[in-house]
């Protein structure tokens, strides 16, 4: 597998059981007349506007499916459905994919979404300016060809379950080839919305694409408003300044929205593994006994209760329950402080160990950090807690790897392969794990599931990290907003399902 210099982890495998795939488009949630403006509260601002060249889940959250479209997309159940492609076929040898584009599809400029546009977009995603995460998604691809105006043929150098799934995310976005400006300041997509403006630190504004080729945008304007203080975000929804909070980051406040005449609360699942990550180049953390000791020393049930109001599922490895290869591995390291102390003694740290814990200033980071400081102190581990703004976390932790331990929610779908990347920020190298992922990607559907289960168990046994819990999806909306989805299983906050009851 290719190495990666920088990655915020995306997408792994999709079991393919099709030779021809064609589905209907997402249903219109209703015929309501759209209100003029939709105000959305969130806490994770984009790091930039170009999904091909910047890392950070906040960018795709706003732009994917809304401004930029893909040949295929994920619906709220995690199923792959057509978007710009009407359908696709796969050859018997699993090496050739043929996509037929929707003849109605066009960019906001009015230009048609042509096969040449798709080829140019995919080649850009394979180029040197793309993040290594994006380029790695295209590693199995040999050639990309436009055989006519509406047909794209992609050949692979090896079979890959992962590759088609990648097309549903940022690696698969299609951009207008006629655009010669700066993707970091303007948009050139085919989605129902266009980028309008960005007041950094406060607001990203989208406007309706009046020339949209599909179901028209139901809002003239969408404002993603960003709050560092979750209490302030809650207050904005309660006072009517917001129409929706994408994910309630103070679950203990859910009772504030119990008036069903004013609000609707939607609880579902995410891909967001809250990971206590280890820098495996740290001398102490390079030792299995130390990593296992930390896993034994943490009472994850108590952590979820104390920091996330008991809402959060224990998983035990880098696999959410929505993936076909999920196994509950949460009891691999039951809470056992005496066992933790024994392992630390074996590793040579009987007299104590000091580590830096650097966390992002997101809702979960500081509170979980404080919990861990107190709990690990009970087994002789001193944590020096350092809270960073998310941009600084990306710089110091994710890019420069200046940390010992960190906490972050990896929200990307099917992101097991982050642990197989040579140059990822937690510096984990395990050839047996890498081989299992390669065998899963090129094997049969049954082999894929079996190999990925084995890989997840290997990660857990090796204590490659401590998977604290899986974030729930708790979306709270004004009662006048319909079409709110329970689950968040892609990187997008898909506006196409939302409408106003007014």
Summary of predicted features, one role per range:
Residues 475-502:
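Long beta-strand-rich cores associated with HINT superfamily self-processing modules
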């Amino acid at each position: 597998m290719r190495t990666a210099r920088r990655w915020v982890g995306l997408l792994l495998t999709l079991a393919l059981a099709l030779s021809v795939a064609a589905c209907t488009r997402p249903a219109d949630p209703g015929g309501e007349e759209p209100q003029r403006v939709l105000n959305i509260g969130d806490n994770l601002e984009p790091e930039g506007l170009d999904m091909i060249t910047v890392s950070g889940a906040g960018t795709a959250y706003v732009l994917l499916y809304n401004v930029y479209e893909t040949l295929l997309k994920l619906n709220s159940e995690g199923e792959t459905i057509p978007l710009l492609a009407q359908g696709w076929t796969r050859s018997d040898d699993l090496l050739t994919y043929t996509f037929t584009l929707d003849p109605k599809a066009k960019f906001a400029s009015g230009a048609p979404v042509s096969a040449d546009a798709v080829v140019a977009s995919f080649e850009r995603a394979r180029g040197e300016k793309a993040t290594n995460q994006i380029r790695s998604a295209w590693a199995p691809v040999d050639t990309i060809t436009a055989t006519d105006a509406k047909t794209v043929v992609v050949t692979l150098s090896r079979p890959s379950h992962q590759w088609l799934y990648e097309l549903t995310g940022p690696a698969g976005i299609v951009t207008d080839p006629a655009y010669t400006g700066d993707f970091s300041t303007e948009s050139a997509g085919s989605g129902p919305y266009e980028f309008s403006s960005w007041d950094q630190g406060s607001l990203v504004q989208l406007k309706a694409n009046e020339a949209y080729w599909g179901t028209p945008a139901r809002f003239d304007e969408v404002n993603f408003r960003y709050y560092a203080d979750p209490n302030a975000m809650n207050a904005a929804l309660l006072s009517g300044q917001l129409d929706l909070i994408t994910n309630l980051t103070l679950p203990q406040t859910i009772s504030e929205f119990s008036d069903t005449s004013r609000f609707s609360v939607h609880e579902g699942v995410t891909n967001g593994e809250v990971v206590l990550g280890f820098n495996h180049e740290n001398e102490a953390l390079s030792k299995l006994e130390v990593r296992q000791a930390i896993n034994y020393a943490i009472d994850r049930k108590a952590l979820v209760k104390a920091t996330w109001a008991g809402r959060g599922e224990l998983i035990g490895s880098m696999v959410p329950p929505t993936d076909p290869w999920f196994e509950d591995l949460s009891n691999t390291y039951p809470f056992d402080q005496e066992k933790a102390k024994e392992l630390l003694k074996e590793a040579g740290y009987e007299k104590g160990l000091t580590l830096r814990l650097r966390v992002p200033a997101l809702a979960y980071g500081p509170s979980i950090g404080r919990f861990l400081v107190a709990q690990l102190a009970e087994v002789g581990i001193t944590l020096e807690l350092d809270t960073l703004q998310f941009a600084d976390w990306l710089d110091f932790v994710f890019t420069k790897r200046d940390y010992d331990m960190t906490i972050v929610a990896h929200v990307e779908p099917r992101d097991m392969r982050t642990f197989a990347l040579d140059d990822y920020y937690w510096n984990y190298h395990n050839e047996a794990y890498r081989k299992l992922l390669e065998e899963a990607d090129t094997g049969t559907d049954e082999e894929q599931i079996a190999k990925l289960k084995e890989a997840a168990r290997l990660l857990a046994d090796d204590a490659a990290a401590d998977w604290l819990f899986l974030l729930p999806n708790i979306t709270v909306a004004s009662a006048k907003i319909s079409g709110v989805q329970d689950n968040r299983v892609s990187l997008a906050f898909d506006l196409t399902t939302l409408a106003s009851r007014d």
